[in-house]
Amino acid sequence: MSKSSPKGLCCTASWPPTRPTRPLGHPKQGRFEPTHAGLGGYLYVADTLAGAVAEGVLRNQTISKAGVVRRPWLVNKKLVRVSLVSDVTVASVYGSGATKLNLDSALLCGGVSQYSQTRETGTKILLKTKPAFGMRYRCRNHDNLTSLMLITRKDPALSLTLVDEVDIFFDKRGRDLILGVLHTEFQLQYTGLLPN
């Protein structure tokens, strides 16, 4: 178990709590999204910009040997910064946290074909860990980064405040942030036309 403090978090994907849970094997399922409706909605976040890029831009992309970022990876996406209203407890499912849970890190870092299994495992962890409002896990696209999946639960529900929101391609500020991280952290570059 670890604490996540009320600082800026970068959102990478979400599934509103008002929608039913996705079935196992759904083509758009995330690695840990809950399979049990009682856990509420969820939000994938990173506590660094590099983590948000790894999960929100590079997730499931085939990267060429030339290291070129494709335009579709960047369009129709926003960088959203939120803040937790108060500290929350999350289950750590990497490093010694995974060892304490008798988990094989190969399972937790597997590809999309293993997401049904990781979803079931993550749901079991959250159902048995009542104080946890999510899980912190190793990022698949960067060994030195971790990401979080936060859940809403009920009584008391998780509370977030919107801090900032910017389009990562059409807004120059967002584009500069994302392209800068792609270059410095991942040694990737976008070579296509840029909007005005």
Model-derived features with residue positions:
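Active-site and NAD+-binding cores of ADP-ribose-processing enzymes
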Residues: 1-27, 62-196
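Extended catalytic/binding region for NAD+/ADP-ribose chemistry, centered on the ART fold
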Residues: 32-64
